[in-house]
Amino acid sequence: DSSTSRGLGDVYKRQVILCALQVQYSLALNLQKDWLIDGSSYQAKVTTTDKELCLSNGLLSRTFILSPNVATIAFDNLMNGNAELRAIRPEAVLTINGMEYPVGGLYKQPVQNFLNNDFIEDMISCDTAFTYVSHTVGETIERFPYRPKQEWLSNKNPWPAPGKRIVFTYKAAPRAPEMIRNVTVKVIYELYDGAPILSKQIEVENQGKSSIVLNSFKSEILALTETAPKVHYGEPHEIRMLAQEPGTYTRNYRKSPAQTDAPREYIDRFTQLFVVTDYAMGGDMEAMKDNPAVRWVFDHPEYEATGIRYYGQYKPARLEVCPPIGPDYEITPGMTFRSCTAFEMLRDATDNERRGLAECRFWRMMAPWTQENPIFMHVRRSDEASVKAAIDQCAAVGFEMVIMTFGSGFNIENNSPEYMEMMKRLNAYAHSKGIALGGYSLLASRGAKTEDAAISRKTGKPATTREEGSRFGKSPCLASSWGDTYFGKLRSFLSLIHISEPTRRRGIS
């Protein structure tokens, strides 16, 4: 009857109000202020005890044990109280001259799906691992010089993003082979003020008398907690990137580590961690394939015995940051190799709107040049009269840049004196009108000689199709002598002309 309906309605309203109050109380309990609105109170700091070091900013914390070797023993989301780490892994892994060596880390964890202090007390250092020597604490430093174009910025952010920086130094173990005894490894962390963002990079320095080859590396390894069930583990779509056969990774996923290169919607189902490196490409249009150094793998065999099983299957619960190929880099005496930088952001929500706002903040802080958005016009011909006409049009209507587009005839590789003089005149004319001048240089989809082409891992010959590992047909390899010449010409042109250059670097095999 109506009275019963009203009674149920009142009960429902009270339940909704109670739930809302509980959510508000929970948020107030965890955070005094919403970091997306005002993150000024969340300052990065480093605290140390006799055996531990903690890097925290009130939103994210990462805790390290210092003895018997450095290892990450906690990775906590302070926004919701979640512990993200379930098992200890090495701080990094290097393959040098064909031999694999862990950096830091502890071993003999009896159970892999959770971690407690009793486990840690009984764990030991690997006798082949690079061993902790010292650490330094300081402020964040810029990864490279960056001069913002203030007139193009929609949001102004400091560079570098302020925060704290820790550098852990490791030496080879006493029983290590002679070839690596004079190798020093540095693991570098930066935690930033005002956001749950952490970055990590490794450096390998050869202080010996002989060259070594860094065949491959893993600069980050995190065994993470699983946050949501997923019945079907998905088929990786890594065929395009590595030219692998379908099913390569999932065919025997119980027997070997399997990588997923699935869409981000799938990855987001089981982790609150957003990860990207400066190897990323493609404008994030295909999120995982454009982020090739970030790998989500099934944590076998360690996790097999003690992990939680959903319908007899597992989700990829281990993060690894490593390039899919190589680098096979020769480090000569006195030289230092620097890896890509991994950026990790913990999320505090599952809804797309808040996650999207967090990613916007991430890019503004970590890559503030993404906020430089000039209003530009493409000019279809690069002869002097056409470019000047386009410059005049842009100046008249308030545009800020002219770009000599594909097929316009602009050739940044033309270093003839006549061409250089014409470009200098056009650049000076553009600047006199308050207009920046740029041009496209086609990199990948231009064809290549056989000796300069990117080689398919599948065929051993120049890649020509997506299945063979090429996005744009036969493409030049940047590691070839052609690549050295190409970039040398670009740098020479830009230094002589002082042109503003949005060089288009399309997907590389």
Give the positions of each predicted feature:
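Active-site-adjacent "subsite" loops/lids of carbohydrate-active enzymes
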Residues: 423, 439-495
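Short Pro-Gly-centered flexible turn/kink motifs
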Residues: 329-347
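The substrate-binding groove and active-site-proximal loops of carbohydrate-active enzymes
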Residues: 373-384, 405-420, 468-487
